Amino acid sequence: MGEEYEKLVEILTVATDDNFILDSSRSYFDCTNYYFEIDKESTFQKRGPSKENRRDPIVGMGLLLDAQMLPVGMKIFPGNESEKPVMRDLIHDLKSRNNIKGRTIQIADKGLNCAKNSIEAIDNGDGYLFSKSVKTLPERERQWVLLDDGFETVFQSERRTRL
C-alpha cells in the first residue's frame, strides 16, 4: 500500500457503504501500535514507546468505526509520535473526511488517557471510555471498583458478561 494507503482506504470505505450502508449516527475511535521486526526505520516505522517495551520500529494507527462497528476510516502515523495530541487531529480528520456528524466514543488505554482528550471529547459532544489500572487507584476508589453490586449480568450464548 505504501504512501497511497489513504486512497485504498477511501475506496474500501465507499465499497463498504455501497454494500452495507454505514451508520454514522454514532462512531467509535481507537488507536493502537504495531511493531516490525526490522532493523531500519522508515517514514512511518519509527522507534517509539511500546507497551511491550520492545525496541523495534512501530507504527501508530487510528481507526474509526461506525455504529455497527464497520470500519469507516483509518490513518497511520509515525510510531515515535505521542498518540495524545495525534488522537484529537485523527478524530477530527476522519470525521470530516467521512462526513460523520454523530457522536464519537473515544476508546483509550492509559496511553491516551489525559485531561486534554477528555475535555475535547466533552466539548465536541462526544464521549469517551478510558481505562485506568485498578492497581494504581487510591484505596477508596479500588474498593468501589471491585464491589460486586451495580452490575447487570448479560448472557450471550455460552459467554457471561458483567456490565
Residue ranges and their predicted role:
Residues 1-163:
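Anion-binding and metal-coordination hotspots
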